[in-house]
Amino acid sequence: VIKRLLFALCFSSNCLWAQPPAQNPDAQKRALLKISAAEKAYKKDLWPNINPAYFFANLRKNVEHPLYIHQGKPTYFCGYAALTHLLALVDPEEYVKLVVDVLQSGHTLTKDHKKLTATKEIREAAGTLYNKGEMDINHADQVWFMVLADSYKGYLNWKNPTYKPGGENGFWAASNYKKFNRMLRSLTGLEVHARGADLIGPIMGSYYDFIEEKNEENTVILYLNNKVLYPNKFFKFILRTPTHFVVLYDLKREGKYNVLDYWDYGLRTQMKLRKNKFRKLVYGITYIENQ
């Protein structure tokens, strides 16, 4: 206004940049009250494998500490985690409303009136994902990410439209760039601008200068080629398209390098890249005017 999650937020070395808006404390309090009310009213009818203690602890943590939101390893939930990071920051009440609706009734409506539905396969699988790091006990994330993956489809999902065990690690869960921006508009109700594509980066001069300009009054989300960002990562990439979405906190120049300070995998991370490598890294630049 987020296979190591999410978005990255940018600043320049000589100009103050806009970060994602700080979470409104009153909105956070109202969101936490909604969580407490939902916890008291919870019935385990729809979700046989959800542990309510894990679920509500996870939901509270996401509202209180959006930076900690994590996609799990080695899933393709990166885009959903990035979206959730942003939504929990800018509209924690809407985020809680959507997740609690899905928990209580198995469906919810987004701001653009899209119906998100938890299918029988999703309801039975949520709570059973394991060997995913901290996601093993993040049951709210399991519910929410799986519902998003099942409700929004792009061309990467055509051959795997229905969840099957292990689908979180492959094409069923993948997000291409156009799908990600569509989800972002749907969930936030905000005007979303995007430059770039899955197979080629934005056609323009300096990426750095463009991001610097847009980040003065916008939150900037980058679509990155993870094979360039993390060439030695332990898991195997199976997609030929970029796979990583990050929300940038700072971008500055240090001699021959661009230094990125960004959020992904539940942390803020800093990385120094040569300028030519930075251009190879970026495939999409999404920006949203800060409210």
Regions inferred by a protein language model and the residue ranges of each:
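Bacterial Sec-dependent N-terminal signal peptides
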Residues: 1-20
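Active-site nucleophile-adjacent alpha helix/oxyanion-hole segment immediately C-terminal to the catalytic cysteine
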Residues: 25-160, 211-221
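Short, flexible loop/turn elements at secondary-structure junctions
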Residues: 74, 82, 87, 224-228, ...
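Extracellular-facing segments of soluble proteins and assemblies that are Gly/Ser/Thr-biased and enriched
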Residues: 128-200
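Short, flexible beta-strand-to-coil junctions
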Residues: 149-164, 223-230, 252, 265-267
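Active-site-adjacent substructure of cysteine-protease-like catalytic cores
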Residues: 195-260
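Cys-His-centered catalytic/binding microenvironment captured across papain-like cysteine peptidases
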Residues: 236-243, 252-291
